[in-house]
């Protein structure tokens, strides 16, 4: 195989990996790009791409004094979020995808997508993006190569992964890698003018678990196009994890340091809109306690001799912007202060800064909104899209834990599950053991609110382990992997806790202040692990007593805290039928241990409700 066989290659290929070169050559024949470029991951390359995208109208350079080396992108209004209805797990057998995923036969899907891929990069450059999941120092790293026609994706991948020549060197002449194909689906004919945000109305985001391939078409946005993120780090990695005996989870990783300098590490899984990023970057309100962030979104967990260790496979934060401010998440705001940030679909101020709903201070008198239109506080529409994003490197965070670059990871002391429940679920509860905790995670749910247009208010939206859109195989087998890990780890496994920051009183007010004060709950979790405090026995487990929480300096009335810690049996009884139906929906591969734990929960509810 010679590099001459890769039509349009700019310069010599910086690799001797024949498998990689053959794959690229085949892709070139399918996509028909004008040029092929191996990216090196350098700052000079990033700057050059940014300049080109500013000229093309895709990026707007922000005020250099306020946001150094930072840019704003505005996507097409049809391309603003993950599209779960167009996301497929194409396992050989439909039952292996399970009831929570869209399925299509793999060869039929490849045939269909190949029709769309044919010639889809005409007039564009195909970028070869080698990347490493997790620290590049890992002696046995998980690697990938994404072929893409989107410079925005290349720029995002440089922030979100360890990308470029170092990753290519890790792949070497004979190394294996996950193959990721991506095209925005907007070919350019000779002389045709490009648009600022190329995409296609037809979209596919497809994972092939047996062959560890990812094919994406039609979208340039976020997790649809930055294939190292949800597609690899969760959907494909969860399949690898089951096969190899580890776990790929939708979890933050937090380092908590007590006044004596002892560090603890917590992993936590929350569905969307439940405060995950804010907890990952928490600023404790308890004197003497500090926190550092290892990761805000994804954890890969592996057993070692003395316990369960977590690594963050990502290199950056891809956070939701609206609602982020110096009160709710000062660390996120400070992380963006030095610049080097890629913003998408936020508003633009008249002096070249960015703005979104929920930012500190009053809204400016005039903005350009995320669609490029004039906006004033009297406008009916939001200035920033609700799913607008900031993309920034972790090592720029003032609270970045140095261990985020340690390939061996950090030993996890506790795992938290939490949804958004106005009632039923107490503020914090320790589960009885790993199997009980697995059942609690399997039934994780958030109550629907009036804000959910299609939902019946009060019904539960189930999201097992906050992994519902990201389990790359049968959900019952995914739960079996949890049980298997617990059996292997035994008493070395971390304790599992259930938390709920969102309990409301009868008048609708929140009973718990949340945000930085959630450190008080984390302190109780640590105290519980260390055996320093007792607990009340409730239907769901060992629930905290109000007097055991450190409430010094908290304005919240003690009566509210006590109410937030209740687990009313009649409310739990109301959930039983819904939860039973959901376990049935998950199918016959749900482990017997989960069913027996649910039976035990029902028995406790009946006894308390009698």
UniProtKB/Swiss-Prot annotation:
Major localization class: cytoplasm
UniProt entry keywords in alphabetical sequence: Cytoplasm, Decarboxylase, Gluconeogenesis, GTP-binding, Lyase, Manganese, Metal-binding, Nucleotide-binding
Primary role: Involved in the gluconeogenesis. Catalyzes the conversion of oxaloacetate (OAA) to phosphoenolpyruvate (PEP), the rate-limiting step in the metabolic pathway that produces glucose from lactate and other precursors derived from the citric acid cycle.
CDD domains in the cross-refs: PEPCK_GTP (cd00819)
Subunit structure: Monomer.
Protein's name in the database: Phosphoenolpyruvate carboxykinase [GTP]
Protein family per UniProt: Belongs to the phosphoenolpyruvate carboxykinase [GTP] family.
Disruption phenotype: Cells lacking this gene lead to the absence of PEP carboxykinase activity and the inability to grow on acetate or lactate.
EC identifiers of the protein: 4.1.1.32
Annotated GO biological process: cellular response to glucose stimulus; gluconeogenesis; glycerol biosynthetic process from pyruvate; oxaloacetate metabolic process; propionate catabolic process; response to lipid; response to starvation
GO CC list: cytosol
Binding-site residues for GTP, renumbered to this chain: 273-278, 389, 420, 515-518
Active site: 274
Organism of this sequence: Corynebacterium glutamicum (strain ATCC 13032 / DSM 20300 / JCM 1318 / BCRC 11384 / CCUG 27702 / LMG 3730 / NBRC 12168 / NCIMB 10025 / NRRL B-2784 / 534)
Record: residues binding substrate: 82, 221-223, 272, 387-389
């Amino acid at each position: 195989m010679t590099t001459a066989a890769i039509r349009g290659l700019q310069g010599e290929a910086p690799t001797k990996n024949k498998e990689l070169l053959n794959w690229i050559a085949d892709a070139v024949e399918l996509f028909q790009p004008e040029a092929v470029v191996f990216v090196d991951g350098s700052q000079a390359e990033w700057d050059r791409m940014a300049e080109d995208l500013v000229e093309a109208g895709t990026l707007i350079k922000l005020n250099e004094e306020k946001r150094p080396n930072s840019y704003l992108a505005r996507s097409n209004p049809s391309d603003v979020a993950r599209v779960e209805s167009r996301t497929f797990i194409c396992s050989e057998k439909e039952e292996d995808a399970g009831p929570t995923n869209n399925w299509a036969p793999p060869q039929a899907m490849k045939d269909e997508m190949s029709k769309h891929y044919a010639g889809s990069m005409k007039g564009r450059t195909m970028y070869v993006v080698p990347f490493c999941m997790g620290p590049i120092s890992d002696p046995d790293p998980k690697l990938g190569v994404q072929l893409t026609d989107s410079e925005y994706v290349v720029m995002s991948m440089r922030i979100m992964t360890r990308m470029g020549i170092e990753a290519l060197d890790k792949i070497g002449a004979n190394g294996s890698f996950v193959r990721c194909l991506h095209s925005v689906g907007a070919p350019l004919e000779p002389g045709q003018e490009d648009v600022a945000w190329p995409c296609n109305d037809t979209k596919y985001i497809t994972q092939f678990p047996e062959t560890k391939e990812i094919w994406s078409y039609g979208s340039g946005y976020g997790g649809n196009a930055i294939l190292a993120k949800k597609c690899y780090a969760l959907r494909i990695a969860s399949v690898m994890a089951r096969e190899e005996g580890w776990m790929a989870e939708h979890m933050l990783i937090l380092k908590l340091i007590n006044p004596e300098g002892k560090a603890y590490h917590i992993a936590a899984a929350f569905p969307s809109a439940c405060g995950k990023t804010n907890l990952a970057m928490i600023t404790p309100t308890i004197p003497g306690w500090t926190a550092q962030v290892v990761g805000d979104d994804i954890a890969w967990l592996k057993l070692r001799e003395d316990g369960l260790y977590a690594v963050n496979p990502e290199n950056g934060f891809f956070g939701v912007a609206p609602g982020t401010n110096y009160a709710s998440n000062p660390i996120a705001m400070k992380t963006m202060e030095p610049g080097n940030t890629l913003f998408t679909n936020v508003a633009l101020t008249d002096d070249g800064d960015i703005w979104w709903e929920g930012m500190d201070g009053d809204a400016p008198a005039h903005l350009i909104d995320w669609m490029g239109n004039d906006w004033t506080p009297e406008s009916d529409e939001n200035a920033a899209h609700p799913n607008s994003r900031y993309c920034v490197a972790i090592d720029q965070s003032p609270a970045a834990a140095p261990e985020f670059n340690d390939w061996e990871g950090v030993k996890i002391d506790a795992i938290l599950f939490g949804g958004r429940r106005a009632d039923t679920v107490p503020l914090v509860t320790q589960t009885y053991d790993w199997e009980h905790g697995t059942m609690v995670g399997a039934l994780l749910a958030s109550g629907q609110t009036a804000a959910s247009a299609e939902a019946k208010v009060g019904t539960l939206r189930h999201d097992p382990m906050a992994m519902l859109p990201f389990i790359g195989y049968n959900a019952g087998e995914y739960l079996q992997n949890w049980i298997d890990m617990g059996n292997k780890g035994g008493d070395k496994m971390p304790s599992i806790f259930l938390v709920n920051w969102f309990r409301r009183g009868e008048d609708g007010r929140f009973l718990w202040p949340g945000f930085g004060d959630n450190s008080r709950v984390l302190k109780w979790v640590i105290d519980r692990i260390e055996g320093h405090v007792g607990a009340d026995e409730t239907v769901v487990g060992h629930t905290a007593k109000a007097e055991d929480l450190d409430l010094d300096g908290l304005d919240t009335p003690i009566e509210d805290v006590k109410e937030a810690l209740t687990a009313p049996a009649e409310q739990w009884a109301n959930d039983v039928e819904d939860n039973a139906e959901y376990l049935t929906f998950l199918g016959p591969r749900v482990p017997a241990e989960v069913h027996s734990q649910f039976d035990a929960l029902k028995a406790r509810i009946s006894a308390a409700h009698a």
